[in-house]
């Protein structure tokens, strides 16, 4: 619950910014990902339930070392599971691992994360690199970069 609360603080309330790649969101829950949810009227408690079921449980957060729970969960919410796993896989490989960077949180990735003892700061640095690369590819997103950068360092 504590980790979910921190993510909720970063996500804020209702937003429908046409320039935001997330589209219509409330508490970080996107209409595009959850078309059956009344996003505009979503309550904080409703968002917490979605976070727990869809982003925490389904993404196997607790299969990772506890030090990485918060950042992995936050990346799943903000960037999607596949990108989150790819960032962690790259961080493991940057420490001498040899994972296929495929975005799958399978037994080989889980074992390699544990074996490599990849540090939180290493994952943060790969996350910041992802955002920088994204803004390079899509300059229109530069207005979001500072917030993403700050979030990457705080989580």
Task: Label the predicted regions.
Residues 1-155:
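Cell-wall polysaccharide-cleaving catalytic domain and substrate-binding groove, primarily
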């Amino acid at each position: 619950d504590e980790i979910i609360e921190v993510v909720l603080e970063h996500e804020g309330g209702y937003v429908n910014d046409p320039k935001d790649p997330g589209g219509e969101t409330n508490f970080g829950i996107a209409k595009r990902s959850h078309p059956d949810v009344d996003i505009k009227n979503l309550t904080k408690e409703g968002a917490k339930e979605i976070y727990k079921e869809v982003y925490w449980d389904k993404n196997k957060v607790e299969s990772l070392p506890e030090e990485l729970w918060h950042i992995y969960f936050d990346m799943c919410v903000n960037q999607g599971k596949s990108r989150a796993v790819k960032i962690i896989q790259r961080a493991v490989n940057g420490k001498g691992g040899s994972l296929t960077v495929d975005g799958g949180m399978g037994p080989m990735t889980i074992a390699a994360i544990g074996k490599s003892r990849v540090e939180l700061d290493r994952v943060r640095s790969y996350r910041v690199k992802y955002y920088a690369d994204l803004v390079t590819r899509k300059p229109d997103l530069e207005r979001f970069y500072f917030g993403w950068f700050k979030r990457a360092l705080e989580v």
